[in-house]
C-alpha cells in the first residue's frame, strides 16, 4: 500500500504498512539523544502544516547562544523554560523553537516568536537583555545574539526554509557536535508554544502504478523548480534526486515542499489519465 500525505505546503510519499484508517501502534517514549530522522520529519510536517495567512502578531526571528556550554541538558532546559516564561510576560502569543549545535560543541536556540500589541516598543533589545541575564553563568555576549523582525509571509517562509531544509546529517544537527556530557540525554530538539493555525494533513492511498508515475512527475517538477530558481546548487541536487539502485527504487519515497494547488493539479492530471487512488 502506497500513501501520500498532503500538507498545506508539501507532501510525503511512501510505502504504508497499515490499511487506511487503521490505528498505528506507538512505541514507548525514551530519552532523547539529539536529532533523529523521526524528530526531523515531525518538525518538517508541523512547519508544512501552518496556515501562514492566519498568523497574527508581531513576529521576530531569534538566534541565541552562549559562550560556555551548560554542564547538563537539564541546565539548558531550565534556561529555555525560564526564557519562555519571560517572553510570555512580554506578550508572547506563540513560538516555534529549534536547538542546533555549533562546531565547538555548544547549543544555540533558534526561534520564531509572535507577540501581541502589549509588547514593549524596544522588544528586540528587551529580549536580548533577558536572554543574557538568564545565561550570565555561561558568558553570553549581546553581540552574539540576533533578534530580527519577520515582516511578512516571505520573511516567515525564509525562516521555515532555513530550519526545515536541514536534515539529521547537517553539521548543526550532527551527533558529532553534541557536547560530550550531553551524549546520553539532550532533551527535546524542537517544540512549539501557544496556538498555531494549522491545516490537517490528508492521506491518499494508491497502488504501485500510480505511485511510480507520481514519483516521476515529482522528479520533473523538482528539476523545473530548481531551474526556475537559477540556483546551481539546487539544479545539481535536483539532477541526483531519486537516483538509487533499482532494488531500492521500488520502495523509495519522496518528500517535497510544494504549493498545495500544484500538488492538486498533479493529482487531477493523474486521475484524468486513468491512474487510480484507493
Curated annotation (Swiss-Prot):
InterPro entries: ORF2/G2P_dom. Changing residue 77 to H: In strain: New York. GO terms for molecular function: DNA binding; DNA ligase (ATP) activity; endonuclease activity. Its EC number is 3.1.21.-, 6.5.1.1. GO terms for biological process: DNA replication. It comes from the Viruses. It catalyses: ATP + (deoxyribonucleotide)n-3'-hydroxyl + 5'-phospho-(deoxyribonucleotide)m = (deoxyribonucleotide)n+m + AMP + diphosphate. Keywords: DNA replication, DNA-binding, Endonuclease, Hydrolase, Ligase, Nuclease. Pfam families: REP_ORF2-G2P. Isoform G2P plays an essential role in viral DNA replication. Binds the origin of replication and cleaves the dsDNA replicative form I (RFI) and becomes covalently bound to it via phosphotyrosine bond, generating the dsDNA replicative form II (RFII). In turn, viral DNA replication initiates at the 3'-OH of the cleavage site. After one round of rolling circle synthesis, protein G2P is linked to the newly synthesized ssDNA and joins the ends of the displaced strand to generate a circular single-stranded molecule ready to be packed into a virion. Isoform G10P protein binds to double-stranded DNA and prevents hydrolysis by nucleases. Additionally, G10P is an inhibitor of DNA replication and may have a role in the transition from semiconservative replicative form DNA replication to single-stranded DNA synthesis in the life cycle. Belongs to the inovirus G2P protein family. This is Replication-associated protein G2P. It comes from Pseudomonas phage Pf3 (Bacteriophage Pf3). The gene is II.
Amino acid at each position: 500500500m502506497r500513501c501520500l500525505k498532503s500538507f498545506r505546503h508539501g507532501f510525503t510519499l511512501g510505502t504504508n504498512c497499515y490499511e487506511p484508517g487503521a490505528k498505528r501502534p506507538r512505541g514507548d517514549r525514551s530519552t532523547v539523544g539529539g536529532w533523529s530522522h523521526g524528530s526531523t520529519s515531525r518538525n518538517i510536517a508541523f512547519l508544512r502544516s501552518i496556515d501562514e495567512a492566519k498568523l497574527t502578531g508581531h513576529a521576530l526571528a531569534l538566534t541565541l547562544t552562549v559562550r560556555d556550554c551548560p554542564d547538563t541538558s537539564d541546565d539548558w532546559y531550565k534556561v529555555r523554560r525560564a526564557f519562555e516564561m519571560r517572553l510570555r510576560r512580554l506578550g508572547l502569543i506563540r513560538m516555534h523553537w529549534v536547538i542546533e549545535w555549533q562546531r565547538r560543541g555548544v547549543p544555540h536556540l533558534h526561534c520564531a516568536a509572535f507577540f501581541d500589541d502589549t509588547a514593549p516598543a524596544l522588544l528586540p533589545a528587551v529580549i536580548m537583555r533577558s536572554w543574557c541575564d538568564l545565561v550570565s553563568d555561561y558568558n553570553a555576549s549581546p553581540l552574539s545574539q540576533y533578534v530580527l523582525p519577520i515582516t511578512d509571509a516571505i520573511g516567515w517562509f525564509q525562516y521555515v526554509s532555513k530550519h526545515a531544509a536541514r536534515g539529521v546529517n547537517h553539521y548543526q544537527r550532527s551527533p558529532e557536535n553534541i557536547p560530550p556530557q550531553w551524549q546520553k540525554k539532550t532533551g527535546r530538539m524542537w517544540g512549539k508554544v501557544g496556538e498555531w493555525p494549522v491545516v490537517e494533513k490528508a492521506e491518499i492511498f494508491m497502488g504501485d502504478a500510480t505511485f511510480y508515475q507520481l514519483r516521476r512527475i515529482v522528479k520533473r517538477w523538482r528539476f523545473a523548480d530548481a531551474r526556475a530558481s537559477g540556483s546551481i546548487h539546487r539544479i545539481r541536487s535536483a539532477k541526483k534526486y531519486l537516483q538509487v539502485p533499482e532494488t531500492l527504487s521500488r520502495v523509495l519515497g519522496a518528500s517535497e515542499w510544494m504549493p498545495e494547488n500544484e500538488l492538486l493539479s498533479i493529482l487531477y492530471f493523474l486521475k484524468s489519465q486513468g491512474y487510480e487512488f484507493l
